Amino acid sequence: MRMTSSMAALCVLLLAQPLLAQGWTEYENRVDRFTVPAPGEPKVETITWDSEYGAKFPGRVYRWEQGRTRYSVTVVDYSDAERIHSELGHIAYQGGPGYWTIDIMASIDYAAMLYRQKPGVKVTYDAWHYIERVTGHELQLTNSDDSRSYVGIYLHENRLYVLDATAARNEAPPIIFQQSFGFLDAEGKPVQYRDFYFNRLPPPRLKRP
């Protein structure tokens, strides 16, 4: 039986109540434009994300831990993809304006592939998904140590968001972390879409010969 949207909302609400009692708060980040319920302030790491087509994009990882459960949000900024690809110098990218756009459009699938290819991982759920009407992909995996990972991957305003909640064996599924994730606009306000959102590519800026 498929769960209706009202039933799903009720489940999220019921799951959120004990988390609030455990000291969870709504973490808001206006730099990377997201909000998520989390156990306190995260540890933040600046990263370089290696893309499918050999480009390096700036990003940050936000990490939390509570007991034997780990949570993270990875945000990768693809908005400057055209310039980054133009500086690669590889013959495959010279004069080829399509590669930077492909790198953005394929970013969700590529991130999902990285999870599927982890050593010892068994994928138990692998399907299209959306949160706040922003389209993406959902994965559930059993890891080599029998822990369980619940992963959501979304692309919004040319930022890639990878949500990962990993719980040890026999721990409760930490699905509230993903299901209550939200996106913010440039002014820090929650985005609300009436229709499903599909990422729009940034306009080309570089002159072509």
Model regions: which residues?
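Bacterial N-terminal signal peptides that target proteins for export
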Residues: 1-8
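N-terminal targeting signals for Sec/Tat export/insertion, comprising classic cleavable signal peptides
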Residues: 30-55
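Short, solvent-exposed coil/turn segments at beta-strand boundaries
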Residues: 37-41, 66-70, 134, 154-161, ...
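N-terminal signal peptide c-region/cleavage motif recognized by signal peptidases
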Residues: 16-18
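Conserved polar/disulfide-associated segments of primarily extracytoplasmic proteins
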Residues: 50-148
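Solvent-exposed coil/turn segments that connect beta secondary-structure elements
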Residues: 32, 67, 78, 144-146, ...
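Surface-exposed amphipathic alpha-helical segments
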Residues: 30, 42, 92-96, 100-101, ...
